[in-house]
Amino acid sequence: MRGRLSVVTVGCKANFADSAAILTHAARAGFEVVEGGAPADVLVINSCTVTRRADRDCRALARRLRREHPGAVLVMTGCFAETTPEARAKVPEVNHWLGIREPSSSLPRLLRSLAGDAASSGEELSDFAADRLLGHSRVFLKVQDGCDAACAYCVVPKARGAGRSLPRREVVE
């Protein structure tokens, strides 16, 4: 099905870096990347779950995109995608859920599947890889993701996992 792919990003700078990487993966898989929310065959919501309002906004965004693009494949990734099955069940509009901790292997595979490519290239791309500007004058360089702190009020470690960083050599390159 190759075609057009659009990413709508909700949340923090880490999500914007993740969205840039998603767009890089999509372009490499042969998709035409279009502006967030523009008509597309595949719509990706890079979601946030840091507050109850963010959860509500992501659910509303999924409903709106489904209403506006009834034939599109709707993919939800980001922190909201890491929430409980009960929370996911409240968003039946989503066709595919992609956890934030799995994009390096799952995203290329999902994109190839949506594009109709039966053969897997075995490609695994860095979760941190991005060469898209997302309308900015600078490329996002995410050198660390996740968090090792266990603050009682914060959902980031649960959603993004333990802290992990790019090797210093890769950051410099």
Predicted regions and their residues:
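Proteins enriched for Cys/Gly/acidic motifs involved in redox and nucleic-acid/cofactor modification
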Residues: 1-173
